Amino acid sequence: DDLLANRVGTVIGAFGNTLSQLLFGTNDVSTDVTFWCATTNQPEYVQAYVDDPRITQKLDPSKPIAFLTHGWTDNVNRTWVKQTVADYVRLIGGNICAVDWSPLALVEYNLAARNTPKVGRYLGKFVQFLLTKGFSINQVTLVGHSMGAHISGIAGAYLGGQVPSVIGLDPAGPAFTKPIPVSTDRRLDRTDGRFVQAIHTDKNIIGTTMNLGHQDYYANSGASPQPGCEFPLVNNDTTKAYLQFICSHFKAVEYFRASLDRQNIFEGTACSSYYSYKRNDCSAGTKDDFGLFNK
């Protein structure tokens, strides 16, 4: 489900949507960006809106709320999104909303990247609405994968950098940090929240080697192939490399899902490089945990 190699229809759809946006522009952002929420008592998606008169019936203002934002060509009905929402409700509880911006994401890559600022601002507007309905900014978490990491950062900046936790899952590199970094108002950076984390799992291709948060975790050096993404039975080198970096890009999601269970500890060590880490030569030696349970 998560390998783009299996998404031929997605590529065709992206081509058609790109032509449509270039010729006719986009719809109102409230049409193109939607919020699909679940709670401990209501684990199935319920759509919520800015200025929703029934919002306190759909969500519990007394409980924490997290927002999960997908990346390029994705949507909230992907298996990984639904599994993450289900795990969050089961293991953490409270409220979680999946942010669907698929009409703006299912287009040519650079066009999708240019769409991210307005998506992030609209997410920020939705959070602002929730704050008027009894939610506390101190209970908000923003999580995003790939381009969704930058959307989460933009939303955090829109909210004045006051969100306690912003987490980027293998934040996208191309068009954001490479070939040259864009301005911080268009990407994730450490000023977007009170504590910003990023985990890197495919830093050299889809992701980035640039540190974006207060803490950046480079899982297994942060590069492809991640464990389980080797594809040893694939003989064609080009196909193998492609499958490896796509699989590795989505490993960040798997690591985040696993980290929702307190029994799984994803401990990182502050170090100047992965080479130094492998040599046990980390002068600071500071250790901390990735995810919501960061100390």
Regions found by a protein language model. Give the residues of each.
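Glycine-rich nucleophile elbow surrounding the catalytic serine of serine-hydrolase chemistry
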Residues: 70, 143-154
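Short beta-strand/loop motif that positions the catalytic acidic residue
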Residues: 68, 196-199
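Alpha/beta-hydrolase fold nucleophile elbow
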Residues: 134-146
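Flexible, membrane-associating and regulatory peripheral segments of lipid-active enzymes
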Residues: 1-98, 104-115, 124-137, 161-165, ...
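Active-site nucleophile loop of the alpha/beta-hydrolase fold
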Residues: 167-176, 200-204, 222
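Flexible "cap/lid" loop of the alpha/beta hydrolase fold
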Residues: 175-189
